[in-house]
Amino acid sequence: MECALDAQSLISISLRKIHSSRTQRGGIKLHKNLLVSYVLRNARQLYLSERYAELYRRQQQQQQQQQQPPHHQHQHLAYAAPGMPASAADFGPLQLGGGGDAEAREPVARHQLHQLHQLHQLHLQQQLHQHQHPAPRGCTAAAPVAVAGAPAGCAGALSELPGCAALQPPHGAPHRGQHLEPLQPGPAPLPPPAPAALCPRDPRVPAACSAPSAPPGAAPPTVAASSPPASPAPSSSPGFYRGAYPAPSDFGVHCSSQTTVLDLDTHVVTTVENGYLHQDCCASAHCPCCGQGAPGPGLASAAGCKRKYYPGQEEEDDEEEDAGDLGAEPPGGTPFAPCKRARFEDFCPDSSPDASNISNLISIFGSGFSGLVSRQPDSSEQPPPLNGQLCAKQALASLGAWTRAIVAF
């Protein structure tokens, strides 16, 4: 999708800018706020463009539908002759003689109609001799029947009508002592067999019809037995993240040589070499790094190390750098951060970024871009922020785990 490509390119550019400005004072926070505001603006433009494009398409379709009815009004007069009235096209060819009164007043018309019936019977007999299957002949043989008493120019136009309409007797026109013989089109065609009779013999559907239909009450237990039991997934409910993180902006800005990133959607831990990302792992009970951190004081201080994120936090971070490391690296394994205040040594600002870790971050952030677009109308209703910090806080309050992961920079 274009959205996924745009999200990946946007995240890759932002990661490069943030990584190149990690040595500047306040550079990471600046580019983080720029990233959030830029993403929100682009998502809003994308949402509005798609919405207006859909509205424009609907309006064009409505205009086309309003212009089409005048062309369809004259279609029902296709079989009517030029000299016939418009209402004549709505009747069959044998119903245009004026009913029984017209036949009684015009003996010549009745005689012509009788001759037409005789010709029709002769034609049917010839077709029965020629073809042994008389099923489709009952309707096609009546096509050349013309209307008695109608103008001569109408016969050619009325012959185009379906033949089945010619077999209909005139309504309210009983035969009054005429020598008209009853119309016998031959043996009636066999009705089509019922679908239930062909269903057991049809090889295409052997199981759907041969087996007796189960009652409606028995279907839900079968479906319930085949489907696995639904386990309460805490990651699917937004209340899980609210309980795990008291405030939406509880992530601090840390510069370290090795950093661990936890994806809030999939709970996947990604380690960034020479990076800039750090996210709290101890607040969630389902995080795998809680059991691998330093025992004793490290785990005990995990609950008490939470604090609000405000603009002056970086200065406090600089003052508290001498307090010591609260986390310990497990021997022979990937380093995990048991607390948000954990520090790592050997920070090298001149090293190049790891391409594989950046691609992992791009895949993590690209997966949540659809959620950002879907919830964009809620964030567009808010007033414009005064600065970048308020923009980040409003984005965290209005959006979900995707921007929380962005604020981890």
UniProtKB/Swiss-Prot annotation:
Matching entries from Pfam families are given as: IER (PF05760)
Low complexity bias: where? 196-212, 220-237
Query: From start to end residue, where is composition biased (Acidic residues)?
Result: 313-324
Q: Which InterPro entries match?
A: IER
Chain positions covered by the region annotation Disordered? 168-237, 312-335
Please list the residue ranges that the record marks as compositionally biased, kind Pro residues. Answer: 184-195
In which family does this protein belong, per the annotation?
A: Belongs to the IER family.
What is the protein name for this chain?
Immediate early response gene 5-like protein
